[in-house]
A protein has these predicted regions:
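A generic structural signal for short hydrophobic patches within well-formed alpha-helices
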Residues: 59, 111, 147, 182-183
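Short beta-strand
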Residues: 92-96, 131-133, 196-197
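Conserved long alpha-helical elements within nucleotide-processing catalytic cores of c-di-GMP signaling
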Residues: 60-80, 94-95
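Intrinsically disordered, glycine/charged-rich C-terminal tails and inter-domain linkers
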Residues: 1-40, 44, 173-214
């Protein structure tokens, strides 16, 4: 049985919807047709990066209680605090979407330090006169390893999926959770306490990271 409807096979039109670039779509078509091997695609697009995925707490609740505009202002404040930290710690890419922030780093230690410092500065901001009645807090997830340098975040693959799951769905306010591969890259640090987490519905191993002097 053939598919009875039109399929969009134009790489340039597909790319106009900003999923992947035109080159990536063309290479996916080549991969599908056998003109490109898996190894060739991997060699072209793989790179090793640390992914820091951060989510802001209370976005839905603040929108319901204070209105949408106030919730947007909370997001802006969080971005004003977090983005300078990410740049200071060497983030190669920072992207914001709604109440999420994704940053890429060359090494996992920089991502972890950036997460800790973001938490610290958010707390300082929330204690300042600049804060609102419903201040936001950050939840952070960190992954590290080989990902595909494709898509808007230039990091797609298993470690990106895990970091996003930790930062957006599992981590609580002021909490930093890291994947097993990220833990392997930073576990020798004496200034950080790592605690393996155990949850009933846990999909993969992960660790909670906290500074020892806090």
């Amino acid at each position: 049985m053939t598919f009875p409807h039109d399929l969009l096979d134009d790489a340039s039109i597909l790319a106009s919807f900003e999923g992947w670039s035109e080159d990536v779509y063309r290479d996916f078509f080549r991969l599908r047709s056998g003109e490109m091997t898996d190894e060739e695609f991997n060699e072209k697009y793989h790179w090793d990066r640390a992914i820091l995925s951060m989510d802001m707490t209370g976005f839905t609740a603040s929108a319901m209680r204070r209105g949408e505009l106030q919730s947007f202002l909370r997001i802006m404040d969080a971005q004003r605090v977090a983005i300078p930290v990410l740049r200071e710690f060497g983030a190669e890419l920072v992207r914001c979407f709604a109440d999420d922030i994704v940053a890429l780093f060359k090494d996992a230690n920089s991502a972890l330090d950036a997460a800790f410092e973001t938490h610290r500065r958010v707390r300082l901001f929330n204690d300042s006169p600049l804060s609102t009645d419903y201040p936001t807090q950050c939840c952070a997830g960190i992954g590290y390893g080989r990902v595909f340098a494709i898509g808007p975040n230039l990091a797609q693959g298993d470690e990106m999926n895990r970091a996003s799951k930790l930062g957006e769905d599992i981590a609580r306010a002021n909490e930093t959770l890291i994947t097993e591969r990220a833990f392997a890259a930073v576990s020798s640090r004496d200034d950080v306490h790592f605690e393996q987490q155990d949850q009933d519905d846990q999909l993969f191993p992960f660790y909670r990271a906290t500074l020892r002097n806090e």
